[in-house]
Amino acid sequence: MAAKLELLIAQTILQGFDAQYGRFLEVTAGAQQRFERADWPAVQQAMKKRIHLYDHHVGLVVEQLKCITGQQYFDADFPSRVKAVYTDLLPEYPRFEIAESFFNSVYCRLFRHRDLTPEKLFVFSSQPEGRFRDIPRPLSRDFTANGDVSAMLYNLLTDLPLRLPWENLSRDIDYITLALQQSFSAQQLAGATFQIANELFYRNKAAWLVGKLRVADRVYPFLLPIHHSDSGALFIDTCLTSKAEASIVFGFARSYFMVYAPLPAAMVEWLREILPGKTTAELYMAIGCQKHGKTECYREYLTFMSGSQEQFIIAPGVKGMVMLVFTLPSFDRVFKVIKDEFAPQKEVTQAQVMACYQLVKEHDRVGRMADTQEYENFVVDKARLSPELLAELQREVPDKLEDLGDRIAIRHLYMERRMTPLNLYLEQADEQQMRDAIEEYGNAIKQLAAANIFPGDMLFKNFGVTRHGRVVFYDYDEICYMTEVNFRDIPPPRYPEDELASEPWYSVSPNDVFPEEFRHFLCGDRRIRQVFEEMHRDLFEADYWRGLQQRIRDGHVEDVFAYRKKRRFSQRSGAALPATSATA
């Protein structure tokens, strides 16, 4: 009887995962229709819906299991036996890796993230690594130039499943051909093979054609973002063939792609060749499997720890008033714990901070907000904590610590990609690096605002610089929707004495923001002030912010590109493409 119960529980969990991934694919499959209809609000709703599906189905399975087991008492080894039976169901299962993560989620929900051991959880996968390369059907089609790149591109583009007309296909083919000729010789292109993914990758207002360009013994990305013109016809905005550009397109600060992937492991392996700098976790997250990406992220952390003797240290930079942040010197992640008590000037609660982080997870991050992974009961050996960090943890987050003898459990934390804090970057930057960073910072603010996100605290210390030189926001405790903010001009002083007073001569409500004040706390450095005034003076004007608010209220969804403005065909070729409301 007991063995039958363990099998029933294992089958219930796997069937629950089947239901979840079926709904995941169903929402994903609707991406083409949403794109063709230019239904951008539906795109945003689908993104949130797909993220919520996982936790919803975990909850359904947990309730089923409670009904199955009732009030029965089980011995301590019962969860281990269920895991063993579940493992036996996976060798022939096509999505075994995410099914393991789903099992972990159900276990954690049932047992409140306690007793997280390899005997009861899939800390590492139970299946051989080679299974990731078992592809039952090709994920891509091959196209060869045979000396005529334009003809090959015509065949490739007219073979796409999109049902909208092209605005000017011959023009786009000329643009792509020119871009290829600027990067490769005629001889290289004549013998090149283009491997094009069968599925388009949808995100925001674009459908991405993703491919591999094989030239001799080398492989390059081949990425074409397809957009709508104002008249509803299709056009291609650029052609990207460098791995650095591809890495940014699939970056950790962007929303997850909608790509139909019934075999996600196969898709991840296919992408790896053109995204060699991405970890397995990042690739799963890029295609929308963020919960399994979280599992892989933890596995990458464990692998690093097993091969290193480094101690955790307090992260470099200005200490936060809300978050305690620590890291490992050679690891590319930071760990963020919400402090038990905040500085007096921070009028937020822990629940509000967590809600802000969830908002970022669900919102269009437009390449400007870092993704985070949330963990509970994160166990660390005390010997791996520097004395300074251990003292800081005991001082700032004692309510979130559980002493386990030689180890310590942190009840809740976020893991996030490590970046160079912008304030530290600017201290070391030369003139050109400083100009580039300020341009990026202003663009980040504007793109977030266009996506209906107001950062709140805009100090440089709350932004980071990635290895590609992009500026990304990572401090979320004060973010809110743009439409919730009241942007005001500072009223003129009534008397000369007003300007000398310690208190403002005008009333200030909680949601009031005065953009004129940004100049004072952002532009203390004369060099930075000059560049800021040159590039982003509009950020100091309340009218600019109110104009953005009105566009949002009117239902306008901005175009945000995953590449610099100068990479657009309209900029590179000197020819006009259809007008878009870009904030690139």
UniProtKB/Swiss-Prot annotation:
Compartment annotation: Cytoplasm
Molecular function in Gene Ontology: [isocitrate dehydrogenase (NADP+)] kinase activity; AMP binding; ATP binding; phosphoprotein phosphatase activity; protein serine/threonine kinase activity
The UniProt record lists the keyword ATP-binding: yes
Biological process terms in GO annotation: glucose metabolic process; glyoxylate cycle; tricarboxylic acid cycle
Binding site residues for ATP: 315-321, 336
GO cellular component: a single term: cytoplasm
EC number: 2.7.11.5, 3.1.3.-
Catalytic activity: L-seryl-[isocitrate dehydrogenase] + ATP = O-phospho-L-seryl-[isocitrate dehydrogenase] + ADP + H(+)
Catalytic machinery residues: 371
Family of the protein in this entry: Belongs to the AceK family.
Functional description taken from the UniProt entry: Bifunctional enzyme which can phosphorylate or dephosphorylate isocitrate dehydrogenase (IDH) on a specific serine residue. This is a regulatory mechanism which enables bacteria to bypass the Krebs cycle via the glyoxylate shunt in response to the source of carbon. When bacteria are grown on glucose, IDH is fully active and unphosphorylated, but when grown on acetate or ethanol, the activity of IDH declines drastically concomitant with its phosphorylation.
NCBIfam families named among the record's database cross-references: PRK02946.1 (NF002804)
Official protein name in the record: Isocitrate dehydrogenase kinase/phosphatase
Organism: Serratia proteamaculans (strain 568)
